[in-house]
Regions:
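Start-of-domain marker
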Residues: 24-55, 208
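Extracellular structured ligand-interaction cores
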Residues: 69, 140, 205-207, 218
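Contiguous hydrophobic, core-forming segments of folded domains
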Residues: 82-141
Length: 238
């Protein structure tokens, strides 16, 4: 009897421990694939099928489409994919039926909003600001921004079919840049000091995708001038 009770207690403890570990894992950022393998080794194929992510509720993520044929942005469990149509237009559709060669994602139950300081108007200033306010033990972190940008530039990768890639220059063949001016936007971003060439370019700790509120434009954010007093930064609540 005592042995049976002891075994039951051990089983219950292990179950609780596994449950706690599962909950902890959902709060962390998952990074699949590596940017440098795409840029330098030409590994363009999809390493993750986004349709296979089981828990899509309150999911956030970003990355390129496999074979570098578009951009992906997941906002609050909704997945948006952009593809080049012309030098001045793109197509944005909502679907999880897409694969990515590298991708970062997490589920976030609650956000803590804070006004973006007026001193933060550029991507570099945003990077410095996040590095100051997010302690190392909470990195990598996925965050979001909402509000109005005065000016921004996003790109959508558009590698010609059958292209071989062995350098960043080759990886960006066909890429189209799109301006965004005086528009309300939502930005999903990734910050880490430990993921250069894995999920961020070698010269930055940030990887961000921007989508306009009308959902007519979405892409990788390259340049931005944030409007003073009009942007809100959201960080996950611990």
């Amino acid at each position: 009897m005592i042995k049976s009770l002891g075994a039951l207690l051990i089983f219950c403890f292990q179950t609780l421990l596994l449950t706690a570990q599962d909950q902890q894992a959902t709060e962390k950022v998952t990074v699949v694939g590596r940017m440098k393998d795409v840029m330098w080794k030409g590994q363009l194929y999809g390493n993750i099928n986004l349709d296979t992510i089981i828990d899509k509720k309150q999911l956030y993520g970003l990355g390129p489409v496999e074979y570098l044929t578009g951009e992906i942005m997941i906002v609050d469990g909704r997945c948006f994919v952009s593809k080049v149509e012309t030098d001045t237009s793109m197509r944005v559709e909502e679907t999880f039926a897409v694969k990515a060669p590298f991708f970062g994602y997490t589920t976030i139950d609650q956000w803590k909003p804070q006004s973006l300081p007026d001193s933060v108007q550029s991507i570099r200033q945003l990077e410095d600001h996040i590095q100051r306010i997010v302690p190392p033990e909470r990195r990598p972190v996925i965050f979001k921004l909402t509000g109005k940008v005065e000016n921004a530039v996003v790109h959508v990768v558009n590698l010609p079919r059958g292209s071989k890639v062995s350098s960043p220059a080759e990886a960006h063949q066909g890429q189209v840049n799109y301006p965004v001016q005086d528009q309300e936007v939502e930005i999903v971003g990734f910050f880490s000091t430990e993921h250069k060439t894995i999920f961020t370019h070698h010269e930055t700790f940030l990887h961000m995708h921007l989508m306009t509120d009308d959902r007519k434009k979405m892409g990788h954010l390259d340049e931005a001038q944030f409007k003073k007093g009009a942007m809100t930064l959201y960080l996950p609540i611990e």
